[in-house]
Amino acid sequence: MTTMTASQVIGLLNLEPHPEGGWYRQSFADRPDSAGRPLSTAIYYLLEGGKRNAWHRVDATEIWHWYGGDPMRIETSHDGVHRIEALLGPDLMSGERPQFVIPASHWQRTSCLGDWSLIGCTVTPGFQFSRFELAEPGWEPG
């Protein structure tokens, strides 16, 4: 496999800046339910080294999938007080996992543990920016 830079991946996948930080592009939107919300959506998401996205939550279950680059740390909080961490990546022997589920309404943020991380995120019911909540700057669980 050829080693690519984050800029090359961003260009090849036509990614755009995401409001929470990082780069993304929606790759799939399922048919809508009776209220017009897609049954599910999927995105590519890239986070560059030394960066982490802002704490945020959505009203739907998210399934994160590792695709390439370096591992990614995912932090979540179900109650805004307690925090858990998981590693998304290919090295199963070191505790990384290629998939991680974040239940609806859980606070979350991610950080890249190398040069860049490319993941996919499948959301059900489908992601809508109107149901996305960004935490106040500086907010941390606890």
What are these regions (language model features)?
Residues 2-101, 107-110, 114-117, 121-142:
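Non-catalytic, conserved peripheral segments adjacent to functional cores
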